[in-house]
Amino acid sequence: MASLQLMAGPLGERLAAHLLRRSTFGFSATDIAAFATKTASQAVDDLLTFPTVPSPPIDPKTGQTWIGTNTSWQNSPEGSLKKYVLVWWLEEAFSSTSLLHKMMLFLHQNFVNDLTTQSVDLYHQLMLFRHYAKGSYKTLAGKVCLDNAMLVYLNSQQSTGINPNENYPRELLELFTIGKGPQIGAGNYTTYTEHDIKEASRLFTGFRVDSSYTQIDPDTNLPRGNPNPWQHDQTNKTFSSAFQNRTITGGNTDAGMIQEILDFIAMVFDQDATAQNICRKLYRYFVHYKITPEIEQDIIVPLAQILKSNNYSLEIALKTLLKSEHFYDRDDQDHGDEIIGGMVKNPLELFMGTIQYFGVELPDKQTNKDQYYRLFWKDNFFDYLCLEAGMDVYNPIDVAGYPAYYQEPAMDDLWVSGTTLSFRYLFAGHADPGDTGAYLQPDIHATGCNGICE
């Protein structure tokens, strides 16, 4: 019987390594030894202790940040700046053994965006994910509705009272929150209906990107979009029986428009199906892609009850799941048949973890900014290694995110193909302890491999 019962006793090296593999982007042999002496409760609590927020990202061309400045004419091209924002997110994982960075990727996968957004908006979105990495998924869902990057990505900024756009409300329901259930009638997906999408599309009219960044969210202190009541459908919105036929009162002020969003989010997150869908996402991300009827009944349903009763606290859900006997495959007689070693790493996890475990030496970011930021991270790590291995980091093919997290039955096997597998092997061949990184050579694309394929 699958069980959320607390795992007792010290982890030992095997289970400590399992926990670190699932919860971080990388760790060392020293980390394994340290975590081996901890109980699951102690270890997970440590992983949920996050580092302080680092300074904003640096543009190697100027040696300064461009966030919050008016120096665009001095900076690197916008495409490069976006990659330097990703460096800001990921490089901290080399010095911090915590759940933070994996949770930020989880939130990106579940509130998908891409690199068509501006670098400053990308930074603000990652800061938003960082802020709620162990906070309330419900609260975050409301904040994302006003996120400048999301307003652009799913066309909300084009939505008016006269011409509502259905893109964002459709994806919010189907992909970000409650999920689509079995279709039981024309336009009826059990958990919501086409009528609900149309009503929600009217609710999300009139919100505009604020490129001046003067609209500040009081809870996060981050910029957000700008409500425009004159372009908003100010009438009431009534939803289907899937949402108990609730009516949300239309607003005719900035505050009224924001209250409509809060009321809508509250309505969606009042449903048990929303909590269960989010818990399935957590399970597939941290434990295993396969959710059997037993897992649904004994893990997903009780975990969803815990999540919902605690205002969708990700911290409480993570503690419950990652401290459980089930996570360590200790809830049946065979302790090695299902969970441990049962997931294929994405390229980001594989490459970052390999670099950290084997102590691959990276260029010095202080004395050689160009080689560190541009040649290693941008040209080689993001634009070559991860891309050729099947993961365009923070730039999934569509709004559903990376197929390995949702496309059944293959799921995480999708990370591996005849083409992508070769890059995993080639990278591993250059990850020797103390290696300065043959894959750090410049002009990879010009030579075809230049250090990786030799």
Locations of regions flagged by a protein language model:
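Active-site substrate-binding loop specific to GH73 endo-beta-N-acetylglucosaminidase modules
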Residues: 1-3, 36-39, 48, 55, ...
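Hydrophobic alpha-helical membrane-insertion signals
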Residues: 9-68
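Short, solvent-exposed loop/edge-beta patches enriched in aromatic
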Residues: 12, 27-28, 52, 94-103, ...
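Cytochrome P450 heme-thiolate monooxygenase catalytic domain
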Residues: 105-113, 279-280, 300-301
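Structured, charged N-terminal subsegments at the starts of enzyme catalytic cores
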Residues: 73, 81-98, 105
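Short, flexible active-site-proximal loops enriched in glycine and acidic residues
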Residues: 99-103, 114-120, 162-164
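Flexible, low-complexity segments enriched for small/polar residues
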Residues: 5-13, 17-28, 271-310, 318-454
